[in-house]
Regions:
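A structural signal for multi-pass alpha-helical bundles of membrane permease subunits
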Residues: 1-213
């Protein structure tokens, strides 16, 4: 088994999936926080989707992927990872944007800035800590995703969460525990390193809005 191949698959799919989750959730979070679009019903619905067992979506997604040729592809896996992480990212971003001082945006509107310009040049810079924390959490959840990695991939796009389990399969001489342990350590390094590098942003995002000045 090629552990580097599995690591590369997970890295590419997790990065793309995390980026897509942020790109999808950020505008939606702004609309919910500032314009109350769907805040009363859509946000609770999206949050409650996290409680739904993902296995019920496996067969429909598999059949759809089979039709469009996304089975065993990194991009296909990344799409699923993005959709799985959107609820978490949406909740974090919406609560953070709601705590931002609206006076700065109002001043921007007085100067003639539109919604998209405010979103890009005012809201986004003030939300960098939460965006960074959300990206890290989305990356870690994507990296650890096992179910869809097992069902939707066979060889080319197999993630490390699935590939690592192959080393525990008994072969001629039984399980090689030394190799299996080394593989598991390698599999945990990327999210661990990213978490250590970004822990300050995660801490700041968790305390954002706790103190009103």
């Amino acid at each position: 088994f090629d552990i580097l191949h599995f690591l590369t698959n997970s890295l590419v799919a997790s990065l793309i999936g995390s980026a897509l989750a942020i790109a999808l959730a950020f505008p939606a979070a702004y609309a919910m926080a500032r314009f109350n679009v769907g805040r009363a019903w859509l946000l609770p619905l999206v949050v409650n989707l996290r409680a739904v067992p993902l296995i019920i979506f496996a067969i429909p997604i598999y059949l759809m992927y089979q039709q469009v040729g996304l089975l065993d592809t990194r991009f296909g896996l990344a799409l699923i990872l993005a959709l799985v992480n959107v609820p978490l990212v949406l909740v974090l971003l919406a609560s953070s944007i709601a705590d931002l001082p609206i006076e700065i945006e109002e001043a921007g509107r007085v100067d003639g800035a539109g919604t998209l310009r405010l979103l890009a040049y005012v809201v986004a810079p003030m939300s960098l800590n939460v965006v960074a924390a959300s990206s890290v959490l989305a990356f870690i959840y994507s990296w650890n995703e096992f179910l869809f990695g097992l069902i939707m991939t066979t060889n080319k796009a197999t993630p490390v969460s699935v590939g690592a389990s192959f080393f525990f399969a008994a072969s001629g001489g039984g399980v090689r525990w030394g190799v299996a342990a080394a593989v598991m350590i390698l599999a945990t390094l990327p999210p661990l390193v990213i978490g250590l590098v970004m822990y300050r942003q995660i801490g700041r995002s968790m305390t954002a809005g706790a103190v009103k000045g």
